[in-house]
Amino acid sequence: KAESSTGSEAAAESVESRDDLLGLTAAEAKAMLADPLMILVNHTNQMPENYTFETAECGSKTAVNKTLQTVACNAFLELQKAAAAENVTVWMQSGYRSVSYQTNLYEKKTNYYKQQGYDDAKAKEMAAAIVNPPGYSEHNCGLAADLNSPEHTGLDEGFENTAAFRWL
């Protein structure tokens, strides 16, 4: 059976045989799974190759990648506005990444580990622990963003100690 561009069509069809729908009716679960934003992309779930979407620019001047899927961009701008109303500053450090950009990040990290003396397989494994391989990053579907604030500009756990993190 062919999958839709989000993979949700096959998931929606499997709802009929499930009894663990978290209190949803089968119709409600099917409707939710038919939503093109209901996509799971991570280190074990690759983004469908034919997944397409429109982007909008919503990042700060310093953002590496300033775009997100239009719906995510609009949500981020609303979030940013609400934070500002409470004197909290939050910005997008990095948003949508094309698969080719993700490939570059992943290969750069892999090559770093190879230069440290690791073989190809181990270097790729170590790189994947830090930078998801192309097609396996939430950033590739335009629905993920790395956020930051003036209190902490690094892309690490230090953000947890900021007013922006507490506000979020």
Specify the residue positions occupied by each region the protein language model found.
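Extracytoplasmic cell-surface/polysaccharide-interacting catalytic and binding patches
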Residues: 1-95, 99-168
